[in-house]
Amino acid sequence: MIRADLATIPTYVPGRRLVDATKLSSNEVSFSPLPAAVDAVTEATWGANRYPDMGAVELREALAEHLEVEFDQVTVGCGSSALCQQLVQATCAQGDEVIFPWRSFEAYPIFAQVAGATPVAIPLTADQNHDLDAMAAAITDKTRLIFICNPNNPSGTTITQAQFDNFMEKVPNDVVVGLDEAYFEFNRADDTPVATEEIHRHDNVIGLRTFSKAYGLAGLRVGYAFGNAEIIAAMNKVAIPFAVNSAAQAAALASLNSADELMERVEETVEKRDAVVSALGAAPTQANFVWLPGEGAAELAAKLAEHGIVIRAFPEGARISVTNAEETDKLLRAWEAINAG
């Protein structure tokens, strides 16, 4: 009754929760949604007896203006993760290949396998960045899609413009490159590709961003993709009907129109991020988290949990979200306590 290959597909593991603990395991912001977004959600719920606008026309129009693209070059989905899955479904058939860095966003291989495609994971370099040369070398006649996570989750590293340009010279025009910029608003790298520019240089590049992180709408699930109109149309074709609810659309639109207020919050996170990097001796990061590679992540997570701090432990290292001043102070006090002995 059940597909036999599902037994081999890993289950997505969300960040851990503990009652009364400070949750730094899911790269969420600690701020509530912007006031305008809260008001928009309240208003939208009065129409919850009606289906949402399946085409999300008003939101897509605003995004098109924001991104400086045409209306048919942008779509929205139930978080950028859903759009990643739609991109796989739109490009891959049984036996096709999806290339991605590893470790990176852990849903990439899941989405590939669910679609019947073959996941091709390329290990990060020693400095925890994309090995773009190895990713290019892995391209075969079965490759249909390549994900680049910039900044990368969980390492927080970014690639340079020259690295991306060199990589794209090796990518066939019929292979789609998904430039996943879920942490775009936190990125302060001077030399790195930006999807809004790359989609005009390459017809096979699709940008992917979200309202879940910097915008503080993780609980409402809304993201957006932009680029080649033909690819966007194909992504819409495989989307779940009415996936982005009315409240999510309203909140995203209101948040998009409150950019100045949003960036004030983001700057606080960036400031605290740099302080955490210094205190923990972590490598520089361009996201709202720090990455501590190496063994012992589970042990570190257990010790911090004893002090009311929940982080994310991976086999390759520990990822710690950075939020606001109050939660950063709690983290640093806990860090000092476990290292005092």
From Swiss-Prot:
Family annotation (PROSITE patterns): AA_TRANSFER_CLASS_2
GO-annotated molecular function: aromatic-amino-acid transaminase activity; histidinol-phosphate transaminase activity; pyridoxal phosphate binding
Disrupted-gene phenotype: The absence of this gene and the ilvE gene results in an auxotrophic requirement for phenylalanine when the double mutant is grown on minimal medium.
Enzyme class: transferase
The keyword Repeat is assigned to this record: no
Keywords for the protein's UniProt record, in alphabetical order: Aminotransferase, Pyridoxal phosphate, Transferase
InterPro entries: Aminotrans_II_pyridoxalP_BS, Aminotransferase_I/II_large, ArAT, HisP_aminotrans, HistidinolP_aminotransfase, PyrdxlP-dep_Trfase, PyrdxlP-dep_Trfase_major, PyrdxlP-dep_Trfase_small
EC code(s) of this entry: 2.6.1.57
Cofactor(s) recorded in Swiss-Prot or TrEMBL: pyridoxal 5'-phosphate
GO biological process: L-histidine biosynthetic process
Modification type N6-(pyridoxal phosphate)lysine: residues: 213
Disulfide-linked positions: none
Catalytic reaction annotation: an aromatic L-alpha-amino acid + 2-oxoglutarate = an aromatic oxo-acid + L-glutamate
PANTHER family found in the cross-reference section: HISTIDINOL-PHOSPHATE AMINOTRANSFERASE, HISTIDINOL-PHOSPHATE AMINOTRANSFERASE 2
UniProt similarity note: Belongs to the class-II pyridoxal-phosphate-dependent aminotransferase family.
HAMAP family registered for this protein in UniProt: HisC_aminotrans_2, Phe_aminotrans_2
Function of the molecule: Aminotransferase that catalyzes the conversion of aromatic amino acids and 2-oxoglutarate into corresponding aromatic oxo acids and L-glutamate. May catalyze the transamination reaction in phenylalanine biosynthesis.
Assembly description: Homodimer.
Name used for this protein in its record: Aromatic amino acid aminotransferase
Organism of derivation: Corynebacterium glutamicum (strain ATCC 13032 / DSM 20300 / JCM 1318 / BCRC 11384 / CCUG 27702 / LMG 3730 / NBRC 12168 / NCIMB 10025 / NRRL B-2784 / 534)
